[in-house]
């Protein structure tokens, strides 16, 4: 069963990819969807056996690298962390496959699309089930390649090409960090197996642990789109909407957080790295929330909400509360997939229009989609008793319960981010469903609600977005839960969950919720009562500057294009002049060219004309005679003559 969880997505991807022309579009739909649904059911069984019954499973397939210094095998582990990750990965992937059968029905490349989706899922499964860092790295790279193929699925679109290349290049930075981290782990521990590395981590020098932790942080920042390496995530919206749902909810961006969760036995002994992780997460959450407030593309608004929520996950990992991070990661998958698929339903109904300014008045025309979008947005805002409430507010409370300088600051940053999250969620809902109709008339004339095959995944995700957090709260973050066993490690000195639960002032617990409600009513008041206020504010010089700053994403793209590219071009020029210029000129190519040129010139002296040879003899004689004037001692001149006339005779005798 456990091997089937891995092999079924790979089998469906292979069949749809290589036999797509034989089985057709319907056959590809049937094989990929049935395989993913079956795999999701097996994941539920695995969650029951491993997570609830406490029976972890380890599988060793075969030896991969067997040398004197390194032993790596194709091994897979199913513990509480793995099966918890399998739930969002496989359930969301199965629902996305079902949803895509109708959403992508008119596309001529259905077989390729579903093959890519299944391959994406397979590599994510390899990433979360591998029992050593090298197998994880294979899945890590596979997820990156699959995301490139899916973002660039419509490869005739220039923007899709740029977005895919951007995603690949930005993730290369994270891959660089992971690669160095792998070498550092091998050099430090002599092994890449999780059990060996984690057992030895408490006895390793803290400086080495910090270096390894920072390398893993860089890797996670690239894959999970943290500030500085986040610019690829909004541009990834150029791919089909089901791809966006899969990338943002279950795969790709969660890989970086999973790396931190799996490496918790290492991170816990690198205090400096934990502080860095906390601040990276807090700054990302604040940055993404403020940026999403003034975006005009529906999918980009949701993309920045993903970036902000990932920042909260990093924040709580830096606070060493890995169980809360896993809980919010799973919760986030449900309502984020619901938001993206609901947005896809709106875009599908409005003739592929994505601009919020060209929507409006859709609540009466798309009541079902409107209901789904409201559920997803309220769960994202952490409205009480929805799924997001049980984990998101707990993260913010833990920041204050850390009782440190960093903890207090990141608490306020996260609280402000929560306020902006509520504001851009309500803004996107209002502009899409409640405002005045602003789109072309033809879009409204042809509008249609999502068909049944697209509605079923939305209903399932809505149920998870409402009830999952309440049902599983005690399992994931309850006091004294033994769900994790040894899958996660929290140093006893870093355990603050009990203090936060019972020792935090009630005012600090309610502050994020009150701020979110104030932000909600503030946005509604601006659009319903003071509807002219936004236009008046933007018409001022200060308003234009603020709007442009947030709308242009803090000018990160401009900075990279105008400043970073200059350094890269300088490096390219230096490489071209030195490595491929001066070094080659005086190196092998230069020597070969010098000898070739000299030999060509010497061979050109052989003209075949007797007068030319007579001139050579005469010039040689003149040169020989002039040596008398340069050699002061006549005995040296006699010795020279003797050498000239006797050397040929010696050669002849031999």
Swiss-Prot record:
Keywords: Electron transport, Membrane, Mitochondrion, Mitochondrion inner membrane, NAD, Respiratory chain, Translocase, Transmembrane, Transmembrane helix, Transport, Ubiquinone. Its EC number is 7.1.1.2. InterPro entries: NADH_DH_su5_C (IPR010934), NADHpl_OxRdtase_5_subgr (IPR018393), ND/Mrp_TM (IPR001750), NU5C-like (IPR003945), Proton_antipo_N (IPR001516). It catalyses: a ubiquinone + NADH + 5 H(+)(in) = a ubiquinol + NAD(+) + 4 H(+)(out). Pfam families: NADH5_C, Proton_antipo_M, Proton_antipo_N. GO terms for molecular function: NADH dehydrogenase (ubiquinone) activity. The chain crosses the membrane at residues 1-21, 30-50, 76-96, 113-133, 135-155, 178-198, 200-220, 241-261, 274-294, 301-320, 324-346, 365-385, 406-426, 451-471, 510-530, 612-632. It is found in: Mitochondrion inner membrane. GO terms for biological process: ATP synthesis coupled electron transport; electron transport coupled proton transport. It is a multi-pass membrane protein. One of its GO terms (cellular component) is mitochondrial inner membrane. Its main location: mitochondrion. Belongs to the complex I subunit 5 family. Core subunit of the mitochondrial membrane respiratory chain NADH dehydrogenase (Complex I) that is believed to belong to the minimal assembly required for catalysis. Complex I functions in the transfer of electrons from NADH to the respiratory chain. The immediate electron acceptor for the enzyme is believed to be ubiquinone. PANTHER family: NADH-UBIQUINONE OXIDOREDUCTASE CHAIN 5. This is NADH-ubiquinone oxidoreductase chain 5. It comes from Rhizopus stolonifer (Rhizopus nigricans).
């Amino acid at each position: 069963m456990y091997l089937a969880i891995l092999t079924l997505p790979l089998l469906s991807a292979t069949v749809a990819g290589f036999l797509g022309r034989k089985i057709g579009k319907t056959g590809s739909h049937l094989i990929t969807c049935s395989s993913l649904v079956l795999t999701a059911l097996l994941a539920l069984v695995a969650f029951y056996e491993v997570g609830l019954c406490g029976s972890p499973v380890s599988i060793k397939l075969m030896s991969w690298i067997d040398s004197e210094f390194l032993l790596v095998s194709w091994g897979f582990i199913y513990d509480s962390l793995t099966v918890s990750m399998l739930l969002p990965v496989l359930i969301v992937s199965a629902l996305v496959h079902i949803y895509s059968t109708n959403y992508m029905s008119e596309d001529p490349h259905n077989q390729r699309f579903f093959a890519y989706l299944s391959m994406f899922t397979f590599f994510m499964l390899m990433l979360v089930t591998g029992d050593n860092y090298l197998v994880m790295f294979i899945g890590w790279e596979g997820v990156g390649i699959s995301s490139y193929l899916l973002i660039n699925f419509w490869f005739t679109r220039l923007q899709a090409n740029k977005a895919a290349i951007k995603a690949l290049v930005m993730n290369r930075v994270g891959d660089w960090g992971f690669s160095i981290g792998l070498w550092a782990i091998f050099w430090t521990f002599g092994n890449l197996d999780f059990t060996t590395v984690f057992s030895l981590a408490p006895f390793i020098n803290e400086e080495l642990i910090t270096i390894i932790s920072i390398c893993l942080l860089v890797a996670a920042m690239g894959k999970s789109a943290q500030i500085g390496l986040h610019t690829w995530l909004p541009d990834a919206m150029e791919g089909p909407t089901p791809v966006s749902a899969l990338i943002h909810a279950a795969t790709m961006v969660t890989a970086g957080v999973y790396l931190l969760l799996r490496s918790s036995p290492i991170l816990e002994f690198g205090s400096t790295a934990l502080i860095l992780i906390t601040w990276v997460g807090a700054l990302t959450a604040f940055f993404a929330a403020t940026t999403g407030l003034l975006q005009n593309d529906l999918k980009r608004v949701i993309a920045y909400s993903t970036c902000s929520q990932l920042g909260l996950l990093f924040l709580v990992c830096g606070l060493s509360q890995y169980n809360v991070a896993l809980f919010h990661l799973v919760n986030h998958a449900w309502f984020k997939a619901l938001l993206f698929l609901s947005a896809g339903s709106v875009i599908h109904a409005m003739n592929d229009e994505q601009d919020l300014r060209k929507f409006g008045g859709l609540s009466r025309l798309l009541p079902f989609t409107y209901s789904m979008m409201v559920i997803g947005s309220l769960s994202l805002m952490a409205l009480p008793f929805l799924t997001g409430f049980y984990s998101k507010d707990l993260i913010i409370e833990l920041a204050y319960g850390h009782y440190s300088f960093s903890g207090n600051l990141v608490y306020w940053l996260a609280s402000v981010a929560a306020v902006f999250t509520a504001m851009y969620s309500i803004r996107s809902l209002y502009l899409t469903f409640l405002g005045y109709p602003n789109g072309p008339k033809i879009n409204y004339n042809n509008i249609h609600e999502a068909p049944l095959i697209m509605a079923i995944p939305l209903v399932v995700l809505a149920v998870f977005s409402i009830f999952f957090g309440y049902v599983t709260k005690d399992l994931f973050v309850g006091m004294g839960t033994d769900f994790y066993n040894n899958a996660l490690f929290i140093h006893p000195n870093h355990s603050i969950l009990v203090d936060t639960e019972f020792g935090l002032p009630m005012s600090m617990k309610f502050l994020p919720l009150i701020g979110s409600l104030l932000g909600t009513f503030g946005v509604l008041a601006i659009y319903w009562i003071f509807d002219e206020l936004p236009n008046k504010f933007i018409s001022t010089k200060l308003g234009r500057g603020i709007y442009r700053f947030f709308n242009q994403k803090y000018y990160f793209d401009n900075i990279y294009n105008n400043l970073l590219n200059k350094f890269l071009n300088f490096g390219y020029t230096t490489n071209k002049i030195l490595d491929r210029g001066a070094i080659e000129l005086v190196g092998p190519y230069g020597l070969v060219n010098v000898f070739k040129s000299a030999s060509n010139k010497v061979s050109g002296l052989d003209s075949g004309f007797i007068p030319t040879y007579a001139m050579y003899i005469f010039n040689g004689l003149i040169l020989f005679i002039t040596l008398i004037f340069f050699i002061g001692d006549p005995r040296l001149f006699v010795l020279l003559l003797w050498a000239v006339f006797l050397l040929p005779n010696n050669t002849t005798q031999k």
